[in-house]
Amino acid sequence: MTMTKDGTLTGTIDGTFTAEKMYGAVWNDYAEYRTQKEIIEPGYCVASTDDGQVYKTTEKFQACDGIVSDTFGFAIGETDECKTPLAVAGRVLAYCSGNREDYHAGDTVCAGPEGKVCKMTREEIREWPDRIVGIVSEIPEYETWGTDEVLVNGRIWIKVK
């Protein structure tokens, strides 16, 4: 490890790292790697087969394992077979069904056709509470996000449940 004059640490750690506090994280979610039935780009809702492979959701209210993430700051479970990171906590960029302008911060969403999130009505929330994927937290106006300049590509921010 090397520390610069401004206190920045750089380097690689082999073994255990312990810190009392950490600040300044620039990524938004915690992800779990899963095996995939097909290549799925970030931003899509996925369901899983009985053997645990994920695939894009195909219908509204389909049980959803998560949203494929390219904004995670921490991930677990990557192996030679598990290459698809699913957001399990925090915020993730997701593609939405229909007109993006119809979505607003605070809207509840579920999985939908083509792996896109769908806005839920109050009645649907009462009928299908187990199908809630998350809550819209922001409709970005910017084209890239973060230090790696992740393409937003028309996606919206979802706080995953």
Language model feature labels by segment:
Residues T2-K161:
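Extracellular receptor-binding modules and their adjoining Ser/Thr/Gly/Asp/Asn-rich linkers
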